[in-house]
Structures are given as C-alpha cells and as structure tokens.
Amino acid sequence: MVASNQSEVNIGMVGHVDHGKTSLTRKLTGVWTDTHSEELKRGISIRLGYADCEIKKCESCNEPECYTVDKKCDCCSGKVETLRKISFVDAPGHETLMATMLSGASLMDGAILVIAASEECPQPQTKEHLMALDALGVKNILIVQNKIDLVTEEQAVENYEQIQKFTKGTVAEKAPIIPVSAHHGANLDVLLKAIQEFIPTPKRDETVSPRLYVARSFDVNKPGSEIKDLKGGVIGGSIIQGILKVGDEIEIRPGSKVVEGNKTKWVPIITKIISLGAGSKKLKTALPGGLIGVGTELDPNLTKSDALSGSLAGIPGTLPETLEKITIRPQLLERVVGSQDELLIEPLKTNEVLMLNVGTSTTVGVTVSAKAEKVEIKLKLPVCADSGDRVAISRKIGSRWRLIGYGIIL
C-alpha cells in the first residue's frame, strides 16, 4: 500500500547556527521554515521547522545532472519521474536551543550535517549536533560543506580536510562530504543523488499498533472565529509504526495534568481523528515516515502553543505506561562538547538535576540513585516510553544544558 501524498523518510537538517540549514531546506523544498515572528526577527530557527520535497530523475540525462526537485529536468527541460518524497526536519543550531534539536532527532531516519566552508571546523554546535545524532542512534549521515561561494578553492580544500579530521572516529567518519552553495543552488543534484544512495527509507512495520511521536500541536482557529466554524485541535509529528486512519479513536499520553488536593496525576486524552494531512495534501490513511498533521475533536485550548508536543499517540490501550520515574543504563561521553573548554565528564551523582530527551519529549529529572550501570531518575514531567528506548542526557554546565551522553531505559 502506497500513500503517494506522504513522505516516506524524515531527514534532519542539523549544524551550527547560521551555517545555512534553513537556506538549504528552502532551496530543496521551496519552503522557508523560519515562520515564527521571533525567528524572522532574530534570523535563527527557534522551533523545529518542517518541509517536504520530491526527489525526481530525468531518464534522458546522465548522473548526477539528472536529479532535481523541479517539475522539469534542469538540463534538458524534459520529463522527470518522482523517485521519493522526503520530509526535512530543520533543527535550530543555536546552543540555547539544544533541547529542541534533541527532541527533533528522535524523528530523524537520517541527517544532513551542514558545515560552512567559511568558518573553522568544527564550530561548537557542529560538534554537539554530531554527538547528539550519535547518542540518539541516527546513523545515516551526509555532510554538506555549504557556502563554497564565499571561499577560495584553497580555503575550501583546507576546510574539507578539517571536516575529515573532525569526523574521524565518529558516526559520520564514512559520510560523504558534498561541497554546495545553497545560495546559488550549486551541486544540489549531487546532494540529491547522495540522499538517494546514503539515506534509504527504513523498513517499517505497518501491521503493528500505530504509534505517533507528537512534535508540535496547534490551535488552527483564527481569533474571532464563529463558534460553528471552530476546528478541533491539531497535533503534528511522525508515525514510527503502524497505520492511522481518519475515524480512528486515539489515546494521547501522558495527557492532561489533573490536580486533586495535594496530588497531581496525568490522565490520558482520548479523541477521534477527524482529518489527516501531509503538507497541503489530505490523506485518508497515514503510514510511517514523513511528517503528518492530525486533526482531532480536541478542545483547541489543549493543543495550542505546542502544549501536547512530546506526547505519544496511538490506539487506546496499546501505549506504554506513563512514567514519573525511569531507570536507565547510562553511556556518558568522555568530554563535554559544544562549549569552548571541553571539560571531562564526571559520573552522574545522586540528587543531580538532568535534562532528558525521550522521543520528542523534553523533561527535567533528579537522580534518586546513581550507580555506574544503573541510574534512577524522578521526572518533573512524566514521559510515555518503553524499556529499550534511548534517552539523551544533558547536564547544566555554567548557564547552559550540555549533552553528556545517553541512556537506555531498563
């Protein structure tokens, strides 16, 4: 079964701030993903941005010139055939927004690490983003050496060698390095060919109970709308397994926070799928892969301003329990990356405050007990997760949260 309107793979666009991730996404998709007023004002990505593109190929022309995202071949203006539709997840590169990048990494089947040829490599967040991909198990990586139009050939070669040295011994050691100018659209055909070769569509199991990682949630109603015209809340994210259909009843966990006296509990939300969409296309059935919007019967107050981002959605009764405490087996990095002085990472201690990313969820927790092989953490915001899931671990160093490793939930 093929949903031709839907992307089949999610590719993260990651790297240091201002290295050209959003510009490259726009060149490939035609969509400028910095759409929030604060982002436009500051010129940086603050939230995760999403955009789709279709990789097409002309049968008449030679490789790599035959690859394009346009309706006609760039070389001969001839007919093109669509090979695959992909979704890009544009992650913020600013160090203060690392939590957003980590929550986006759980949606990524592969990643493009964008490195500007016009700056020394590696820059702090170039390092931190590569470590994050490694920590969260993203293995299919391409490197784009961007802004080659701003440097001489000698500088480009020197930067290329710096990239090779930086990636040696990392998950990106064998990643192709593709020189590109996003501004001029140079070498995009080579990049598209590499995406086809090095970031395959993962095998998905469509027969099991569906699970949707929720990365965004919205109220799509305009202020002053008539009551009869109001639409239910919308959640956006990616199905990691199974299939969702219009009309399905779904459960969203952890759900709503309910305070009774001195006690707080989390109650799962049950709702019905009213509509499914991928980009501007409507779907009746949504498959794993790509980013989708799910229209629901929920009160829009529950979904506005990303209130449900970090949740897990699925068929009622099939989701993991909501956890207010987790036990993990930690795997710490040797040194702190992303800061100028790369300090040695000390073992986790009891009563330490940590930031954790589980799926698309970001939460803070306090270690209740800390041993080398087993750490128990009480969470401020609960998560819905299974044993075996990966958790990114960050520690506050100075005034910033820094990635220090990952853990596996026991």
UniProtKB/Swiss-Prot annotation:
Belongs to the TRAFAC class translation factor GTPase superfamily. Classic translation factor GTPase family. EIF2G subfamily. It comes from the Archaea. GO terms for cellular component: cytosol. It catalyses: GTP + H2O = GDP + phosphate + H(+). Residues 6-203 form the tr-type G domain. Heterotrimer composed of an alpha, a beta and a gamma chain. Residues 43-47 are annotated as: G2. Keywords: GTP-binding, Hydrolase, Initiation factor, Magnesium, Metal-binding, Nucleotide-binding, Protein biosynthesis, Zinc. This is Translation initiation factor 2 subunit gamma. HAMAP family: eIF_2_gamma. GO terms for biological process: formation of translation preinitiation complex. Residues 15-22 are annotated as: G1. Its EC number is 3.6.5.3. Pfam families: eIF2_C, GTP_EFTU, GTP_EFTU_D2. Zn(2+) binds at C58, C61, C73, C76. Mg(2+) 1 binds at T22, S45. Residues 90-93 are annotated as: G3. InterPro entries: EFTu-like_2, eIF2G, eIF2g_C, eIF2g_dom_2, eIF2g_GTP-bd, P-loop_NTPase, Small_GTP-bd, T_Tr_GTP-bd_dom. Residues 181-183 are annotated as: G5. eIF-2 functions in the early steps of protein synthesis by forming a ternary complex with GTP and initiator tRNA. Mg(2+) 2 binds at D18, G43. GO terms for molecular function: GTP binding; GTPase activity; metal ion binding; translation elongation factor activity; translation initiation factor activity; tRNA binding. The gene is eif2g.
